[in-house]
Amino acid sequence: MSQDKIDIKDVTPKTFNPKTHKGNGDRFNPSNRIYVRESKGTFQKLRRYGGWFLLLFFALIPWIPYGERQAILLDIGNQQFNFFGTTLYPQDLTLLALLFVIAAFGLFFITTFLGRVWCGYLCPQTVWTFMYIWFEEKLEGSANKRRKQDSNKLTANLAMRKALKHIAWFSIALATGFTFVGYFVPMKQLVIDFFTFNANFWPVFWVMFFAICTYGNAGWMRSIMCIHMCPYARFQSAMFDKDTFIVGYDSKRGEKRGPRSRKADPKQLGLGDCIDCDLCVQVCPTGIDIRDGLQYECINCGACIDACDNTMERMGYEKGLINYTTEHRLSGKSTKVMRPKLLGYGAVLLVMIGLFFLQVASVDPAGMSVLRDRNQLFRVNSSGEVENTYTLKVINKSQQVQEYNLNVEGLSDVSWYGKQTIQVEPGEVLNLPMSLGADPDKLDSAITTIQFILTDKSNEFTIEVESRFIKKL
């Protein structure tokens, strides 16, 4: 009996050489620490600008007032989402679902086009990690100095500097926890209650929870999150193709690697442009050697590009040995920017954005729902009318007190028992019990479809809700 055999194929990148491999060989061990060297250059400036933008946006939004309320507040307790002058309720949360879909397809589009630039430039894990590394460098020294210090005995001076570092780290973490919870609880009141010891248990719990998570992720786990725990790192390859922009090493130009003096001619020595300085590995936050080829751990941060460009400039060589490029370009072929996968993601993204704005335009500044009395289908009142009882729930989504008029269509000579003009406070859900009465002889059927109508005082909008009027069969 014959057995089918699966062919084994060597998929090791052509540029990988065990003898010259400089990557962190134990980077898959969570206990192994990567000492990231500082890198300076064009792409690192862009990263800093992007990081500062994200930090300022995240930190300032909960402090922005709008009228008497916080501009953006996801009030879970009251089931409201305040977005500047608009208040959204659970029935409007299709908007939130559309936002998530837009964010997802936006990420798919960017990843297919530019690779993992989100990870390298704007991902909160990356931004907070590099902010923590900045404090670490200022208080403990460069990567080489930190590595040497950690391998020696702890001194009093080093212990003090490490203590200051952890105080700075936890201060940032605590501010992050406050800010995040401030999107769900009014920020000013949260801070006042916390520092006057008047806060409730759950807000304090969540502030400390997110503070500890931030401290652990950015201070200790760092690239472990990117390598082992982030699902995006695993499924990103499904969106990559050979025209996706990646951080790539030009092996045709760089090999054979080797040290040399600045005045030496590399061609006479049989060498490529790579001087094997190892800086591209030392500045990599995930500890990989980009010269070994494309690896899923690469977050497209460009740190190795800046490090290599600085080295090429010092040597008098052309920059771009490591650069943002594509697999097709590295193999000497042309890159196709417009391709079916990218156009497909872009088309879906535009459709979702269009649907979102259509949905926003259709959101009414008020809402109404109608509940029939479940205990009694109908009753005959003293006037001989068939009477049905309802509860109207009217929501004022605006920021001002509103006056509404109520009416009904579908019944002739109907009697309205209850208020027909109501005032509703901002954000209030008003429960209005009322009844309708009608002459049974003027009803054509046992069940009549009716429309409750809500209009504002200036007749700028009308809301219609369908219900039923029932008489004796």
Language-model features: where?
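Asparagine-centered strand-capping/turn motif at beta-strand->loop junctions
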Residues: V394-S398
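Membrane-embedded alpha-helical bundles of multi-pass integral membrane proteins
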Residues: S2-G248, G254-K256, I305, E318-L350
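Short acidic, flexible loop segments centered on an aromatic residue
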Residues: Q399-D413
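Cysteine-centered iron-sulfur cluster-binding motifs in ferredoxin-type domains/subunits
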Residues: T111-T126, N217-A233, A264-M312
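Hydrophobic alpha-helical transmembrane segments in integral membrane proteins
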Residues: G354-L377
